[in-house]
Structures are given as C-alpha cells and as structure tokens.
A protein has these predicted regions:
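N-terminal strand-loop element at the rim of the active site
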Residues: 3-8, 12, 19-73, 80-82, ...
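Glycosyltransferase donor-sugar binding loop
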Residues: 36, 175, 230-246, 264
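Carbohydrate-associated surface elements
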Residues: 152, 174
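A short helix/loop element that forms part of the nucleotide-sugar donor recognition site in Leloir-type
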Residues: 180-193, 246-247, 350-351
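Conserved donor-binding/catalytic core segment of Leloir-type glycosyltransferases
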Residues: 194-210, 216-219, 231-232
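Nucleotide-activated donor-binding/catalytic signature segment of Leloir-type glycosyltransferases, i.e.
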Residues: 244-269
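Short hydrophobic beta-strand element within catalytic cores of glycosyltransferases
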Residues: 280-281, 304-307
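Conserved acidic donor-binding segment of nucleotide-sugar-dependent glycosyltransferases
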Residues: 319-320, 324-331, 339-346
C-alpha cells in the first residue's frame, strides 16, 4: 500500500482499510513519506520515502519546484525498487502522486507487479495546469485495476479520463468506527451550545462550492417556521476566501440569533463533538466530484442528512434512506428538506441498522478490495464489487 498522508481523511482511510485487510488474512505493508503515529498495528509501516514540505516555498518558486521534483523522483525510484525487491503480490496506490513521473514509473512497476490505484477524487478540486491533466490521464491508463467509491464516479472516470469501465471497480468508502463518542448533552456542553433547540451542522473547509450562502438563505425560511433552530458553522477558510459574504447574509437576514460560528480549523480530537451535538447535518454543495468526508462522519454518528444531488452524495443518501436529497442552489427546496428531515429525525436515524453497518464495515470493504487485487493478479475482469 502506497500512501503519503499521516493525518486527515486519507490517513484514516488507509489505516482502516489496512486493518480490515489484515482481519481477513492479508499481509500488508504501507510505504509512506510521513511519520505515522506510533500505534499498535497489525501491519508493517515503512517510512521509506522523502517527505514533501511547503517550507521550501520560502525559497524562489523555481527552487521549490526543483526540490519537489527531486524528492518525487527519488521517491518513485525507491518505491519501485523496494516493491520489486520485496516481491509483493500487488501494489495498491492511494491516489495519483506526481503525475509527470507516475506516467513513467507506474509503467515501469507494472512490468514486474500488478498495480491497483484508488481514485478518491475523480475530478480534482483544482486542476491548475492543462499539462497536469494530461499527465493524470496517461497515468490512469497504466494500473491493472482502478477503484472508485460510487457508481457515478465510474462513469465520470470513464468519460473524463477515457478509462475503460472494464478496469474500474466500485468499492464504497468504509465508515470509521467511533471510539467512545460523546453523547448529545455532553457534546453541547463541551461546545457551549444550547440544549433546548434543534441544531443543524454545516461542517468542513469553507469555500464557495460548498453552498453555505444557499443554506443561510434557506435558514431565513426555516426560522420563520421553527424558532428553536440553530445553525452551527464549523470549519476553516481556505486560501483567499473570507467569511465576509456570509456575514453579510447573516446580518441582512437578521440571522445572528440563529447562527453560531467556529471559523477555524477544527482539530481531529474536537470533530466528534460537533457531530454528536447536532440533530441534522446539511451538505448543500454546488459542485463536488469526490466522496465527502463530512457525509461519512455523519454516517458514523448515525445522523440524518440533507445533501445536494451531486457526486456520490445524492446517490448514497437516496440508496441508504438516511436523509433527503435536493437539487443544488435551490433555496426553498433546501429549506423544506431541512424542515422535513428534522420532523422525520427518528425515521431517518432508524435506517442506520445492521444492514448498513455491514455494507460499510471495513471487513466488507477489505473483501471487495481483495477481489480487485485478485483480478489485477489474474488479469481477468473483477467480479462485481458493488
């Protein structure tokens, strides 16, 4: 398993998947360029690769780019040499690393070992260079098998990157297991939130494609019909974005008594408090082509959700019946969906039963992943992974 992240969603995903694979009898080695937290694990972690650092941006852009290219080149060489020397049955990459180099080094590795690649973001949030997109496209033609997390992602991968659907396996993203999550009362006390109202949660990095402005406009309708409502906005601002446009909406619509903000990066140890404290999680995204970590966290806490019908979100929520789906940018339908979801809270929450738990269990995800490995090794089409 090749994965660079040592924090955040990709790290948690890789760690959980590797544990699941070990539980069904696989022997797993993770190659990483980061120092993973020193926890007892049933798999081997090799910090073999050079770590990237944005501190190099203190230098000239050219110097920084040259350093990054050098580290990527060394990483690709060391990774391939190590994998071939260890005679792994399959090499599984968690995303495309450096497409300029991957188009060559993945091809070289494929001559010796079966290669599987999970495409977490079918269309990257930011495609800065046309040339990078062409490198990604070439890199995606190389692996024996590609894994995406939802059916529409399979279609998008085929259409956007010209990948044959015969090489694509659909394997859901597993749900993280919560360790002693706080209850609603304790979570609200911790965050200093009121105990006598229904709380809607908007969580995660704040940027224009997340549709927070649409939710705030919908809140003006919602509060006219439910005075005991509070929207909690929790997350940091990315790049050049600022909160001022949202503050203006709050002020003009007289929503200050119905909104509480935590506009900063939320440390991992605090995240569960926000979800535990909420009655409903809303994702009113306008554009989003990846799997949503916020939605998966809501699933982990068994919270009803309202989501836009884009990417994997609408597909999952409609199938699992844990909430309501609305068209993006639709203010009044969003307001109605939030009101109805709160009124039907217990019905939606009851859908988080054993069947859903098994569907997203890491043992089940590991078994589906193993099928993809077996297809890569044999060269035969994979059995259905959905």
């Amino acid at each position: 398993m090749v994965a660079g992240a040592s924090t955040g969603g990709l790290y948690a995903y890789t760690d959980a998947l590797c544990r699941g694979l070990c539980r069904i009898g696989a022997e797993v080695t993770v190659l990483t360029n980061q120092l993973w937290v020193d926890l007892p694990r049933p798999f081997r972690v090799e910090r073999l690769l050079f770590e990237f650092t944005d501190k190099k941006k203190q230098w000239s852009q050219l110097h920084w780019a040259a350093d990054r290219f050098y580290r990527s080149l060394r990483n690709s060489l060391r990774r391939n040499q190590f994998a071939v020397r260890e005679h792994f049955d399959v090499v599984h990459f968690q995303g495309v690393g450096t497409p300029l180099l991957d188009q060559f080094f993945l091809k070289s590795l494929r001559r010796h070992l079966p290669v599987v690649l999970t495409v977490h973001d079918v269309k990257p949030h930011y495609e800065r260079f046309v040339s990078r997109a062409s490198f990604i496209k070439r890199s995606l033609q190389i692996p024996h098998r590609l894994i995406v997390h939802y059916e529409d992602g399979k279609r998008q991968l085929a259409d956007h990157w010209s990948v044959s659907t015969d090489r694509i396996d659909v394997i859901p993203h597993g749900i993280m297991r919560l360790q002693n999550p706080p209850d609603l009362t304790a979570a609200r006390k911790k965050l200093n939130l009121p105990s006598n109202c229904q709380i809607i949660l908007f969580f995660g990095a704040i940027r224009p494609n997340k549709g927070l402005d649409i939710l705030l406009k919908a809140l003006e309708i919602i509060k006219s019909r439910n005075q005991q409502i509070l929207l909690v906005i929790a997350g940091g601002l990315l790049g050049r974005f600022n909160f001022e446009p949202y503050s203006d909406i709050i002020k003009k619509a007289d929503l200050s008594n119905y909104v509480q903000t935590f506009i900063h990066f939320i440390p991992e140890e605090e995240v569960d408090y926000f979800f535990a404290a909420s009655d409903l999680v809303v994702l009113p995204y306008l554009k989003f082509e990846a799997q949503s970590g916020v939605l998966l966290r809501a699933y982990a806490h068994k919270k009803p959700v309202v989501v836009s019908d884009i990417g994997a979100m609408g597909e999952l929520v409609s199938s699992d019946k844990v909430g309501l789906v609305v068209e993006p940018s639709a203010v009044e339908p969003l307001a109605e969906a939030v009101i109805n979801a709160l009124d039907s809270h217990d019905k939606f929450q009851s859908c988080y039963g054993p069947e859903l738990e098994n569907k997203y269990s890491w043992e089940h995800i590991a078994k589906l992943t193993m099928r993809s490995y077996e297809a890569a090794i044999s060269g035969e089409p994979s059995p259905s992974c959905a």
